[in-house]
Amino acid sequence: MRILVIGAGAVGGYFGGRLAAAGRDVTFLVRAGRAEQLRRAGLEIFDVYGDVMVEAHTLKLLTAEELRARPETFDLILLSTKAYSLESAMADFAPAVGSGTVILPLLNGMRHLDALDRRFGAEHVVGGTTYIVADMDAEGRVHSMTGLHDVTFGERDRVVTARMKAMEATMTGAGFDVRLETDMVAAMWQKWVMLASAGAITCLMRGSIGAVMAAPGGVETARAIIAECAAIATANGHAPMEAALAEGTLRVTEAGSRLRTSMYRDMRKGARVEADQILGDLLERGRARGVEAPLLRAAYAKLSVYSASIKS
């Protein structure tokens, strides 16, 4: 299976690097500057499960300009860009989509599915989620900061197809956890509930989970935000499973936790955030079903003010 990984940042670099190190046929579609960096230094991953070095001479790299000049198609496109970069990413990898190409998006939220369906056709797009806390340093090295490193994927119509089994076989044994999910849409909603909750909690109160839990009213506020997000999912026909919701709630209300969500980390760095895709879209779907979420709305308003400030 020929795999095209879009970008070689924290998430794409981690999973693409793991796949390449395991001998899979992986090509990275990257910007010219990142290509130069990788050709010089290779791709290095620091991980609690053991560090990985993909030597520069073994890396297969393409730029968007090279792909447009000489189009070639791939069996699987692994897409893990930030949601706000989706439109430009689709334009970049469009020449790589052939009649049998599968696009596996590992983006946050759900709105990206509509955009991918419109551009390439729903038959090319499957559902996917990932749980990983990773970052990339100034030298382009990827750092995985917890033991989470899983990819879950599946068709959106609950059918286990031959192409899903082929993807499972390709990714299994590459150094991260792989799960072929039957009810993929439900799994995506489940992640969205907890991702939006954790992002809203940390960004609204500007602290790690542990710092929020230590503040007066922090636990109660966090639980109220989780309840709002779960209510929106339930109203849209995707009530979170009780066990999964309980586990997720424990994770984002853990006393002493050093967890900082990616959105909060981006906010602290003065970088762009995925507020529209993670919080705004969830609020819109809640409003359409008559569900009010005042704390989630406050978090979204705060992030909207922040986003406007970094543009000015």
List each language-model region with its residue ranges:
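NAD(P)+-binding Rossmann beta1-loop-alpha1 motif at the extreme N-terminus of oxidoreductases
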Residues: 1-51
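Short, well-ordered alpha-helices that flank and scaffold nucleotide-derived cofactor binding pockets
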Residues: 17, 21, 91-95, 118, ...
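N-terminal glycine-rich dinucleotide-binding loop that anchors FAD/FMN and/or NAD(P) in oxidoreductases
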Residues: 43-61, 195
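Rossmann-like NAD(P)(H) cofactor-binding subdomain of soluble oxidoreductases
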Residues: 55-141
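Internal alpha-helical scaffold of NAD(P)-dependent oxidoreductase catalytic cores
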Residues: 95-96, 118-126, 139-242
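NAD(P)-dependent Rossmann-like dehydrogenase/reductase catalytic/cofactor-binding core
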Residues: 169, 223-312
